């Protein structure tokens, strides 16, 4: 029992992420959002400076791998802010962190101790992720780009809270046959919604109660 307690109470401040370039890994400070590129010859570079300088919650920041080997998406799981993080072997001019969403989608208090509130899910379109607020069911479509940094965006699919005053993960999503459609599920009540993301415009993004 003591071993179980020790393992469940441990949280990583620094987390290493493998890349598809076997000489390099990314090291994330999960409390502040600082990202460093670590090369196996001993060199290192700061790709992203701390986003929350006074951050004190382990696991607050996460990196998500994309289908582009040089690109990760960093997510602040407390606020929903996210950044496109680029590493490189060509030099520091090719390393950067570009903001995708700079607006807080939730407002944690000092006492907030949220776990995985905001989560991201890759779609079958390599440039598109789904952002979920697992506490209240809000949804956004997140778009990144390696060609045009003016084409980064985070737009709502469902901007309305489906439950109020909840502070734990109760919502999940499930892909359907169409790559554009998913179920949104309240795992507590079984309530379901069907939603669609799209690259064609707002008229093609929708959510409806399923049952």
Regions found by a protein language model. Give the residues of each.
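Periodic aromatic/glycine/histidine/acidic cluster detector
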Residues: 38, 73, 85-86, 130, ...
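Trp- and S/T/G-rich repeat-edge/linker motifs of beta-rich repeat architectures
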Residues: 41-57, 89-114, 146-167, 198-211
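N-terminal targeting signals for Sec/Tat export/insertion, comprising classic cleavable signal peptides
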Residues: 17-42, 46
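Hydrophobic "anchor" residues
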Residues: 34-35, 81-82, 138-139, 191-192
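Short, solvent-exposed interaction modules
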Residues: 55-74, 106-126, 160-187
